[in-house]
Amino acid sequence: MSKKRSSPNRNVQIADQIQRDLSELIMREVKDPRIGIVTIQSVELTPDYAHAKVYFTALTGNPADTQEALNHAAGHLHNLLFKRLHIHTVPTLHFHYDQTIEKAVAMSRLIDEANATRAKDD
């Protein structure tokens, strides 16, 4: 018997829905003071939907404390998602701080420094 595989498009649709729902649920349902203003940047699902890596940025607060608080609330958020999503398996949530913005700023700074050094040499 062959296993039915979900399409990549369905995976993306479910990840997008989880992203939208988590954004709302964190804002309305999670009362942990360590969680300030959080933006869910992306959600990556495993092919079997068992696990979801949730990438976030934090406008306020310490990112490490926010990550700890979100991972502490992951079980509660999982239960709330279960009530909203109409899928057989709601993934276990794993929150990760998204450092893309900081890395982009650092890279831009390095480029600016290299350009300034080159301008001095000319």
From Swiss-Prot:
Main location: cytoplasm
Location relative to the cell: Cytoplasm
GO biological process: one example: maturation of SSU-rRNA
Short name of any one Pfam family annotated for the protein: RBFA
NCBIfam families: rbfA
Assigned protein family: Belongs to the RbfA family.
Summary of subunit composition and partner proteins: Monomer. Binds 30S ribosomal subunits, but not 50S ribosomal subunits or 70S ribosomes.
Role description: One of several proteins that assist in the late maturation steps of the functional core of the 30S ribosomal subunit. Associates with free 30S ribosomal subunits (but not with 30S subunits that are part of 70S ribosomes or polysomes). Required for efficient processing of 16S rRNA. May interact with the 5'-terminal helix region of 16S rRNA.
Protein name: Ribosome-binding factor A
Species this protein is from: Burkholderia thailandensis (strain ATCC 700388 / DSM 13276 / CCUG 48851 / CIP 106301 / E264)
